[in-house]
């Protein structure tokens, strides 16, 4: 972007175009540029710089040369504008190709009366390297005033076609009604337009269709020699139009970057929103299917993984909850384990030892008279195996321990037999309960399974169970809400 550079001398045509507004007000476009302006609705052959830029914007709008998604990009390949620019596309953010084209295709009106003044102005520009501060401030104020006046015409929110026509008519009326002094103030040099990028009315027509893609903009400041130019990111659709005049321009003033706290807060809100949306989709299982799971102490380490569908299930479940595959190495399907050291054997030891002479007093236990626990006695008998049989006392202990081991093994076999008998008895009782009639009607067999959560009770017939479900009654056994009733067939 062009800045107030003073390192190189200006050429004669460029200097002629930068003559003060009192001397030159209008320019004459060359024939290729004039065709483009007339295609956009321009009439006549004499225009101001503002009118030329306005009709260029109208031409881009009518031909729809801008990208619908990224509207700052203008694709002019195969068009008269592209042939005039000598390129396929350009960006509004970098309007230097457009400025170069205007410098080559705009001819200022020089009369015999102004030739001497132009020569004097060129000589003064070559002799003065640095523009005065008054000239810079005046240029900035004039640019800001023109923007402020024309900004009021962009406020109404109308449909796109109506907005374009209205905006174009307002611009034409504005140019027609301006006095000679006001018109001269609008005809600023190209370097003065470069202070804030393209003028407002070039993007103003695109503003109705332009969607801002960022909530903030980043201002950069570059120093070239003594003059300072402000380079602004206008992806948020001309944010400077909504700011005050003091915030829009400042030649030689430091521009602060965007507030980092505001940016971090906006990023944090976006992250919280994404986490909330993901959290809503985490629970993919039916909440009714797990509402009756009362085992809250089961951790993920205790769960077993199904070999078919790789789902983790509760350790108390025999079948996979998802695919109903049988759990691998389920204890009911394994070979019978030996119960020589089972719980029943351990409980049988103190009964025998207490009956063999361990006197339990009726008073409280004291420190001087501890009670001999069966577990300690059993550990002593186990450790006596490792003693040397050469010692007579240890040999007697070994003999005693061998006798006690035989007694323990015989008692273990008896307890196993009792356990099997008890288990068979329970199975018979369960079978008899299943063979009993319905607990409600006492006529039909128990084939109605009442399901609640992950458990169920088989105490009624299917007919009575369905009646309970329709009546909204609870399970007659556990008083839980009946969720489902199924019919059971015993093979």
Curated annotation (Swiss-Prot):
Ranges of residues in domain SWIB/MDM2: 25-108
Transmembrane domains' residue ranges: none
Protein name stated in the entry: Protein Mdm4
Record motif Nuclear localization signal, residues: 443-446
Major localization class: nucleus
Basic and acidic residues biased stretches: 131-152
Top-level division of the source organism's lineage: Eukaryota
UniProt cross-references to PROSITE patterns, sorted A to Z: SWIB_MDM2, ZF_RANBP2_1, ZF_RANBP2_2, ZF_RING_2
InterPro entries recorded: MDM4 (IPR015458), p53_neg-reg_MDM_2/4 (IPR016495), SWIB_MDM2_dom_sf (IPR036885), SWIB_MDM2_domain (IPR003121), Znf_RanBP2 (IPR001876), Znf_RanBP2_sf (IPR036443), Znf_RING (IPR001841), Znf_RING/FYVE/PHD (IPR013083)
GO terms classed as biological process: negative regulation of apoptotic process; protein ubiquitination; regulation of biological quality; regulation of cell cycle
Zinc finger (RanBP2-type): 300-329
Region (Necessary for interaction with USP2): 394-491
GO terms of molecular function: ubiquitin-protein transferase activity; zinc ion binding
Disulfide bond residue pairs: none
First and last residues of each zinc finger (RING-type): 438-479
Subunit organization: Interacts with MDM2, TP53, TP73 and USP2. Found in a trimeric complex with USP2, MDM2 and MDM4. Interacts (phosphorylated) with YWHAG; negatively regulates MDM4 activity toward TP53.
Gene, per the UniProt record: MDM4
Organism expressing this protein natively: Bos taurus (Bovine)
């Amino acid at each position: 972007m062009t800045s107030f550079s003073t390192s190189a001398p200006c050429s004669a045509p460029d200097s002629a175009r930068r003559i003060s507004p009192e001397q030159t007000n209008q320019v004459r476009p060359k024939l290729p540029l004039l065709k483009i302006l007339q295609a956009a609705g321009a009439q006549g052959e004499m225009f101001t710089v503002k009118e030329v830029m306005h009709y260029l914007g109208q031409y881009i709008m009518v031909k729809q040369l801008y990208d619908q998604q990224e509207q700052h990009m203008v694709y002019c390949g195969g068009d008269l504008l592209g042939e005039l620019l000598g390129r396929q596309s350009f960006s509004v953010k970098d309007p230097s190709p457009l400025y170069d084209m205007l410098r080559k295709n705009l001819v200022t009106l020089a009369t015999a009366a102004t030739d001497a003044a132009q020569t004097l102005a060129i000589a003064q520009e070559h002799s003065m390297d640095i523009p005065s501060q008054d000239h810079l401030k005046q240029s900035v104020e004039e640019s800001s005033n023109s923007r402020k006046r024309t900004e009021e015409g962009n406020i109404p929110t109308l449909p796109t076609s109506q907005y374009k026509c209205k905006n174009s008519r307002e611009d034409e009326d504005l140019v027609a009604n301006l006095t000679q002094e006001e018109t001269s103030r609008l005809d600023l040099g190209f370097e003065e337009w470069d202070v804030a990028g393209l003028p407002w009315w070039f993007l103003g027509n695109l503003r109705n269709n332009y969607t801002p893609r960022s909530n903030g903009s980043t201002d950069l400041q570059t120093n070239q020699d003594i003059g300072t130019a402000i380079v602004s990111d206008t992806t948020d659709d001309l944010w400077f139009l909504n700011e005050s005049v003091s915030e829009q321009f400042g030649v030689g003033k430091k521009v602060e970057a965007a507030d980092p706290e505001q940016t971090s807060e906006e990023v944090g809100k976006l992250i919280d929103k994404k986490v909330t949306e993901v959290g809503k989709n985490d629970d993919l299982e039916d909440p009714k299917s797990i509402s009756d799971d009362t085992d809250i102490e089961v951790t993920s380490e205790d769960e077993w993984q199904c070999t078919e569908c790789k789902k983790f299930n509760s350790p108390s479940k025999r079948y996979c909850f998802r695919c109903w595959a049988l759990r691998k190495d389920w204890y009911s399907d394994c070979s019978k384990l030996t119960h020589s050291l089972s719980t029943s054997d351990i409980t049988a030891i103190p009964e025998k030892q207490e009956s063999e002479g361990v006197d339990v007093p009726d008073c409280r236990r004291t420190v001087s008279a501890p009670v001999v626990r069966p577990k300690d006695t059993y550990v002593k008998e186990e450790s006596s195996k490792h003693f040397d049989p050469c010692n007579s006392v240890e040999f007697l202990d070994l003999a005693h321990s061998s006798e006690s081991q035989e007694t323990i093994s015989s008692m273990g076999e008896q307890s196993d037999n009792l356990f099997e008998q008890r288990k068979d008895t329970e199975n018979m009782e369960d079978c008899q309960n299943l063979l009993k009639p319905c607990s409600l009607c006492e006529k039909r067999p128990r084939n109605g399974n009442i399901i609640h959560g992950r458990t169920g009770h088989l105490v009624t017939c299917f007919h009575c169970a369905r009646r309970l479900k329709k009546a909204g009654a609870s399970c007659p056994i556990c008083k839980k809400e009946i969720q489902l009733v199924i019919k059971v067939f015993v093979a």
